[in-house]
């Protein structure tokens, strides 16, 4: 457990991800010398958390591909194009869990990640970062997780060779999840 973590009670129940207090992001190397960070600004998600039988837990996410944002309009447009996500033809990225396990505050979620019609299994370790009741009476739970994937596994193959060697965009991309979920009434 980290020093900032405050697991205050049993978090069993059904939750809806709060997109205004969550971040679904990514980090990739650019020109092999620096990292570019981005995120998806529109997404929905639900979770059923079963603390007694974690294997009965489940998570589903739907991410609007066209909501990708890196802070650079030209790059964002390129990422939305057919070279990468082809957001017009493939408006959603989805994740559906297939297995969940827990060890204290550490959760492992295995699931099917679908991008551009290609589905691959990924295993994402998460840390339960705490629970709280917000000023509006909502019970919230937080999770942070990350996994590194090879974008080519989903058909995201565009690249450009550099004169100095290497390529413009790394094949490996780190997917980052900072999630605040609200317990359903």
Set out the residue ranges of the language-model regions.
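Low-complexity, acidic/polar, glycine-enriched regions of mature
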Residues: 1-185
């Amino acid at each position: 457990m980290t020093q900032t973590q405050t697991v205050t009670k049993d978090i069993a129940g059904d939750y809806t991800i709060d997109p205004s207090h969550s971040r679904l992001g990514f980090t990739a190397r650019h020109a092999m010398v620096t990292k570019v960070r981005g995120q998806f600004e529109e997404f929905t998600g639900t979770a059923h958390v079963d603390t007694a039988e974690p294997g009965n837990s489940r998570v589903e996410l739907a991410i609007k591909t066209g909501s990708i944002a890196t802070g650079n309009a030209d790059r964002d447009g390129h990422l939305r194009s057919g070279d990468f996500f082809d957001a017009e033809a493939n408006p959603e990225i989805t994740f559906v869990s297939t297995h969940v396990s827990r060890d204290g505050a550490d959760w492992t979620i295995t699931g099917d990640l679908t991008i551009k019609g290609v589905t691959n299994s990924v295993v994402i370790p998460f840390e339960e970062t705490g629970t709280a009741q917000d000023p509006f009476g909502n019970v919230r739970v937080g999770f942070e997780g990350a996994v590194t994937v090879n974008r080519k596994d989903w058909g995201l193959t565009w690249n450009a060779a550099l004169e100095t060697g290497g390529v413009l965009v790394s094949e490996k991309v780190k997917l980052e999840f900072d999630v605040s979920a609200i317990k359903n009434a």
